[in-house]
Amino acid sequence: MATIVRQNGLTPIQETNEVKSFLKERGIDYDHWKVPHNASNLTDKEVLVDTEKEELLKKLDDRFETLKAKEGYQSRDLIVLHPNVSGLNEMLAKFDKVHYHTDEEVRYIVDGSGVFGFAFKDEKFLVHVYKDDFISVPRNTNHWFYLDDKKRIKAVRYFQDMSGWVPNYVEETNSLD
């Protein structure tokens, strides 16, 4: 379950309904989608070859079909990050700067964990996401992402249009201070 860390030492938010409510008030869609048990043979592996990635995506396709029907999503892929990924730090450096996309950024965390940061006009906060978390960052929302200390995540990325997923960087710090 996601945890929200706020500025100025405010108490973290951990209860699912409170997390959903907090994020919904800010236009961020959040849900808790259990990864099917028949996928654990793949989610438990650190490294997946392309055929295993496709097999895992197929086991999760009910979610994709729902997003296609309801919101017009056209494609999806699986990103698998772990400490042994070549160029991991360089890759992560693209995401840890404050940016926005002209399309939604939609993620379904199927293993591991990471942190989304959000910068609104008068508020910054972090959302620590874990396995089974679904989050949709609205288009044109300033945010950033980094891996936590475990440096391990498997996430399905859903796209309506790949051209809208290009990051547009802004002059904003990713610090909660």
Swiss-Prot record:
This is Acireductone dioxygenase. Its EC number is 1.13.11.54, 1.13.11.53. It catalyses: 1,2-dihydroxy-5-(methylsulfanyl)pent-1-en-3-one + O2 = 3-(methylsulfanyl)propanoate + CO + formate + 2 H(+); 1,2-dihydroxy-5-(methylsulfanyl)pent-1-en-3-one + O2 = 4-methylsulfanyl-2-oxobutanoate + formate + 2 H(+). Monomer. Belongs to the acireductone dioxygenase (ARD) family. Fe(2+) binds at residues 99, 101, 105, 143. Gene3D superfamilies: Jelly Rolls. One of its GO terms (biological process) is L-methionine salvage from S-adenosylmethionine. The keyword Oxidoreductase applies. Pathway: Amino-acid biosynthesis; L-methionine biosynthesis via salvage pathway; L-methionine from S-methyl-5-thio-alpha-D-ribose 1-phosphate: step 5/6. It is an enzyme of class 1 (oxidoreductase). The keyword Zinc-finger does not apply. Ni(2+) binds at residues 99, 101, 105, 143. One of its GO terms (molecular function) is acireductone dioxygenase [iron(II)-requiring] activity. Keywords: Amino-acid biosynthesis, Dioxygenase, Iron, Metal-binding, Methionine biosynthesis, Nickel, Oxidoreductase. It comes from the Bacteria. The record marks 107 as: Important to generate the dianion. The gene is mtnD. Catalyzes 2 different reactions between oxygen and the acireductone 1,2-dihydroxy-3-keto-5-methylthiopentene (DHK-MTPene) depending upon the metal bound in the active site. Fe-containing acireductone dioxygenase (Fe-ARD) produces formate and 2-keto-4-methylthiobutyrate (KMTB), the alpha-ketoacid precursor of methionine in the methionine recycle pathway. Ni-containing acireductone dioxygenase (Ni-ARD) produces methylthiopropionate, carbon monoxide and formate, and does not lie on the methionine recycle pathway. It holds the Pfam family ARD.
